[in-house]
Amino acid sequence: MRRLLALALLLPIVGGQGGARAEPQQMVAAAHPLAVEAGLDVLRRGGSAVDAAVAVQMMLGVVEPHSSGIGGGGFLLYYDAGTRGIAVYDGREAAPAGATPTMFLHDGRPLPFLDAVASGLSVGVPGAVALLEMAHREHGKLPWADLFTSSIGVARKGFPVSPRLAFWLETIKRLGSEPAARTIYFNEDGSPKKTGERIANPALAGTMERIAAEGARVLREGPIAEEMAARVRGHERPGTLAAADLAAYKPVKREPLCGPYRIWIVCGMPPPSSGGIAILQMLGLLEPFDLRKDKPNDLRALHLIAEAGRLAFADRARYVADPAFVAVPTRQLVAPGYIAERRKLISEDKSMGEQGPVAPGYVEHGTSHMTIVDRAGNAVAFTTTIEGPFGAQMMVGGFILNNELTDFSEVAERDGKPVANRVGPGKRPRSSMSPTFVLDRERKLVLSVGSAGGQRIIGDTLQALVGMLDWNLSAQAALDLPRVANMNGPTELEDKGDLPAQADALRKLGHQVQVRRHEGGLTAVRRKGDGWEGGADPRRDGVAKGE
């Protein structure tokens, strides 16, 4: 473990800085140095990009437990360099069979959001491990059990608390009321662990040892599954999760959602994620305005990006949900003719204001994204989550349970019509996760990108794409950009650099502007010469490293 930590501390924070040396032929970008080193260790041993993703996820569950882990879910894109095809894996959490459209109401009114989060009501059936098991079965090279060695070692021996983990432990102090979490993340006097203090999680090490030996069925049946169900049903605000729900869960393979942007093909996640639709819509809306004429942070670019986001989020709220329950008009929403009609609503001189259904205003700070390319050129873009910081704030087997069901709409009807994203038994809640590949016209991989950050994922990923494709920025420079976003409400400007200085000019165009802190969570890998460069969001603890 000491060797792993020492190597991780030497990792450069940006990719592609190598001067005259050959560009890296394999790359890992993730939210923590130890996770990056775990992935690289697998690649050095001849593992595939999917093998590395398993190792990275397991390590993130140890060192970034506030964002993702065994108790959550995610979406994974896999690029096969040999066939130039894309496989899509949906490991989104699902509502239990006992879920109802009114479960988040109390006396006919929505529960306070944070009360719903920290409750048994919010916990969905986790799917991250099942997703990884399916992807590994199809694209793994190393034995499944060999991919857990690094994370088990760190969980047993301990690791220093990162600045971001320390921040969220200080912020979510109610986590200390969970006995299992208190013994791991808090001191004897009840104070949260601080940056640099050491944490070990032997319970999680034991759970991972079982998963390494037996696979995802450990979470579907047996003692851990039974404990999950009992913990959720025994909460003071109980949910309905049952052992039968865990046993019935299956990840889903889907078709990628792809569309053109200038000379490239952009591919993302279809529903129940809204990310693929929204990003293709926004790129289609923006293409005729030719953002190459602008510089980053120019008023025109900020205005147009915000207006495109406004329209995409209006459609997201109205149409997008789990396609097993709702007929989502996916192809119509990204059709050139439809996008051209929507584009008529955009003026370069004035904001259009709110359009149709408005997205809820809660900002989610959880989730993690990894970007991996192996030596053969195969790639993974994997967005993984337990939803909010520390999910539902409950622990079983050393891992945090998700609060993913709060991604459903609170109300079942609006204006007398069913809401697409209403709660339903077995249904997967709508997501904003946006793992994205960009290919050239020969379907060779150009870049891979994705982000954490709840609904802000879509705008952050879009802005990174614009930075790399339109402004020809390096992967790291694109991720460093100050952020602008509009989710069919106020236009949000990050309180960074010279971006806040544009607030008054945007207000003159009719925008309601909020200047606020932003966490981000992007990672990216981009082709450079005969190799790759990488980037990791400077707002978090992550790095990108290639060899």
Question: Which sequence ranges carry the predicted segments?
Answer:
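Bacterial N-terminal signal peptides
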Residues: 5-16
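Glycine-rich phosphate/pyrophosphate-binding beta-alpha loops
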Residues: 267-276, 368-371, 381-393, 451-458
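Active-site rim segments in enzyme catalytic domains, especially the processed small/beta chain
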Residues: 62-69, 73-88, 105, 239-242, ...
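Noncatalytic scaffold domains of N-terminal-nucleophile
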Residues: 21-37, 41, 49-214, 219-221, ...
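Short, small/polar residue-rich loop motifs at catalytic or cofactor-binding pockets
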Residues: 253, 364-367, 431-433
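Extended C-terminal subregions enriched in glycine
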Residues: 426-428, 461, 470-517
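Internal maturation/activation junctions in enzymes
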Residues: 288-385, 537
